[in-house]
């Protein structure tokens, strides 16, 4: 199957509708992908790239149906990775003497993959060109570490087509080839996901290389990528997007991700997110469980965010393995211009949060105060989690916020008596300075005991006052009671049995707090 691209250029690649894992299992390709190969018929016949090795035989058969293989004068390999040059062994078995134009680094990579050092390699560097007849040339532009050392782009004069390799692409399979034929929102989401998960570590190189290419003052009528769609409608839009994404990109967005053994850390995440929204309703907040959500989606959200909160239960005095794995990914991606903080619950020791803080600092994040809760957080501990969210919302705000109103009246100097072993600890590394979280300012670490029975507001609790579940927002109305749990209508909250469980989330009385009038309407 071939698709006409422009003038004497045809797409001869391969769609892969079924692939769901890329680079091993590192990249989830929920939309499939394509391996784009292009055949140019001018005075010389030129093949740009091949396809993934698993489609080698099919690719060569289809190519042979389109053109006499012996008439191919030149093969250009922009990238030696197997999803670009994977069919070379099958193809070169049919046309063994055909010259292969690639970078010097690509010769090593291709030889290492295919083990044919005798192939007719022609190394090129930036500015080298190849006359292909009819007044047209191919101009080569090295792009090392975008995203391999061997990478390059190829520009075709007169037709003004940039064969851009992995840059500007996306793992996105569609029956259409061009950007103006597909869903624009979905397309841009896949472009950003691709950039965030693959090219982010090389952002400084992206900026420098794009500026170098633009400095050539070459017209670009089309960007022909190695994966996904071809940009023919306003192709500069994706180039400008790359410049934006490469420039310490952030949106007014906060991402929380966590893993939890007993839902305690999840409860903290929910409460922190509630506190953020109370202070800054305009900020976008996303919460992910790393054990259940798509890793690449989480990484994309981290890329988009101004701030990240990472939570974990403590297991064997360290963080949960999936959180550790995610932090390793984040360290490698080298995100910049982002704030971060750790949180989590623990039992007898709380090593996870401290380790997360250290890893975030090592990854280049601007660290804010961390938060720990001992055992299952009760209503007062969750109130502190919400206050923690409020304080982070203020610290991380990208725009002026309304002046905060006091919420927590508990102080470290006059802490209530610990009734159930619930302890909230807030800590901050020395490099983060002194941060206020609704308690006296401090650096280092401190433990703040929290009583189960202390309401986090200054209002008195009336017998007929509704109670709000801080986890799922279900409201207990004393006038209605809860007949399914044998709580009769007219039963005040103080007389509801301690065995009561929230009908919405199944958690006990400790997560309820007096419901503000406006919230209960």
Swiss-Prot record:
Binds 3 Fe cations per monomer. Binds 1 FMN per monomer. Pathway: Nitrogen metabolism; nitric oxide reduction. Residues 254-393 form the Flavodoxin-like domain. Its main location: cytoplasm. FMN binds at residues 260-264, 342-369. The keyword Cytoplasm applies. In the N-terminal section; belongs to the zinc metallo-hydrolase group 3 family. Anaerobic nitric oxide reductase; uses NADH to detoxify nitric oxide (NO), protecting several 4Fe-4S NO-sensitive enzymes. Has at least 2 reductase partners, only one of which (NorW, flavorubredoxin reductase) has been identified. NO probably binds to the di-iron center; electrons enter from the NorW at rubredoxin and are transferred sequentially to the FMN center and the di-iron center. Also able to function as an aerobic oxygen reductase. This is Anaerobic nitric oxide reductase flavorubredoxin. The lineage of its organism: Bacteria, Pseudomonadati, Pseudomonadota, Gammaproteobacteria, Aeromonadales. The gene is norV.
């Amino acid at each position: 199957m071939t698709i006409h691209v422009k003038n004497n250029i045809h797409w001869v690649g391969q769609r892969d509708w079924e692939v769901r894992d890329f680079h091993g299992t590192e990249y989830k390709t929920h939309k499939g992908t394509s391996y784009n190969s292009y055949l140019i018929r001018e005075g010389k016949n030129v093949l740009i790239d091949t396809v993934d090795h698993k489609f080698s035989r099919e690719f060569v058969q289809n190519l042979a149906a389109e053109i006499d293989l012996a008439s191919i004068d030149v093969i250009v390999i922009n990238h030696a990775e197997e999803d670009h040059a994977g069919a070379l062994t099958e193809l070169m078995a049919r046309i063994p003497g055909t010259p292969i134009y690639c970078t010097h680094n690509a010769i090593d990579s291709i030889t290492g993959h295919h083990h044919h050092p005798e192939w007719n390699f022609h190394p090129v560097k930036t500015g080298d060109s190849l006359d292909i007849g009819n007044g047209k040339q191919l101009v080569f532009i090295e792009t090392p570490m975008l995203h391999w050392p061997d990478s390059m782009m190829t520009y075709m004069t007169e037709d003004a087509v940039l064969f851009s390799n992995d840059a500007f692409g996306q793992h996105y399979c569609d029956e259409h080839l061009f950007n103006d034929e597909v869903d624009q929102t979905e397309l841009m989401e896949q472009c950003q996901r691709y950039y965030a998960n693959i090219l982010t570590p090389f952002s400084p190189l992206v900026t420098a290389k794009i500026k170098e290419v633009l400095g050539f003052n070459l017209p670009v009528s089309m960007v022909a990528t190695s994966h996904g769609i071809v940009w023919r409608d306003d192709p500069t839009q994706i180039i400008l997007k790359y410049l934006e994404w490469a420039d310490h990109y952030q949106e007014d967005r906060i991402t929380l991700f966590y893993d939890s053994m007993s839902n305690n850390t999840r409860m903290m995440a929910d409460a922190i997110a509630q506190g953020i929204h109370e202070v800054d309703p305009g900020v976008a907040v996303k919460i992910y469980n790393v054990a259940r959500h798509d890793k690449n989606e989480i990484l994309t959200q981290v890329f988009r965010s101004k701030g990240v909160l990472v939570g974990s239960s403590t297991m064997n005095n360290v963080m949960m393995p999936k959180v550790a794995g995610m932090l390793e990914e984040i360290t490698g991606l080298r995100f910049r211009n982002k704030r971060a903080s750790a949180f989590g619950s623990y039992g007898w020791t709380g090593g996870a949060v401290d380790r997360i803080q250290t890893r975030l600092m090592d990854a280049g994040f601007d660290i804010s105060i961390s938060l720990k809760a001992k055992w299952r957080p009760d209503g007062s501990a969750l109130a502190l989690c919400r206050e923690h969210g409020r304080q982070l919302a203020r610290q991380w705000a990208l725009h002026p916020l309304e002046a905060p109103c006091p919420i927590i009246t508990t102080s470290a100097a006059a802490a209530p008596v610990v009734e159930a072993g619930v302890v909230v600890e807030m800590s901050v590394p020395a490099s983060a300075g002194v941060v206020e979280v609704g308690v006296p300012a401090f650096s280092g670490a401190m433990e703040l005991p929290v009583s189960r029975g202390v309401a986090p507001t200054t209002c008195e609790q009336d017998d007929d006052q509704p109670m709000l579940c801080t986890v799922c927002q279900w409201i207990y109305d004393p006038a209605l009671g809860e007949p399914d749990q044998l709580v009769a209508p007219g039963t005040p909250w103080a007389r509801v049995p301690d065995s009561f469980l929230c009908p919405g989330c199944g958690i006990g009385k400790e997560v309820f707090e007096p419901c503000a009038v406006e919230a209960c309407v």
